UniProtKB/Swiss-Prot annotation:
The gene is rps8e. It comes from the Archaea. This is Small ribosomal subunit protein eS8. Pfam families: Ribosomal_S8e. One of its GO terms (molecular function) is structural constituent of ribosome. Part of the 30S ribosomal subunit. GO terms for cellular component: ribonucleoprotein complex; ribosome. Transmembrane segments: none annotated. It comes from Methanocella arvoryzae (strain DSM 22066 / NBRC 105507 / MRE50). CDD domains: Ribosomal_S8e (cd11382).
Amino acid sequence: MKYQGKSTRKATGGRLRLNRSKRKFELGRDFTIPVIGAQKLKVLNVTGNGSKVRVLKSDVVNVTDPKTGKTQKVKMTTVTENPANKNYVRRNFLTKGTFVTTELGKARITNRPGQDGCINAVLVA
């Protein structure tokens, strides 16, 4: 868990004394980076009696062909390029903007799979 409230230090390095203690709603979660593998989802309970679905592993992607407008669910094999971090390619991490190899060809991921619960992509010529 990450504390996302106000810091206890000033810009000069001096100590700030908080008027109150830390609250539960000020906590955040560590980010999850999905990888290519057998489908594995995680359901999280959130404030307001809701839930979020996160992708931990997935080997399928919803690919849209921009020329025809058709969307298909296809298998992906590897990550070919990742503008976020070159080391993510070696570890097959799936982030927004990642280029993956699918059965239909090369595709670019358009959503944030760690937050959406599915993986959407657009076919690249």
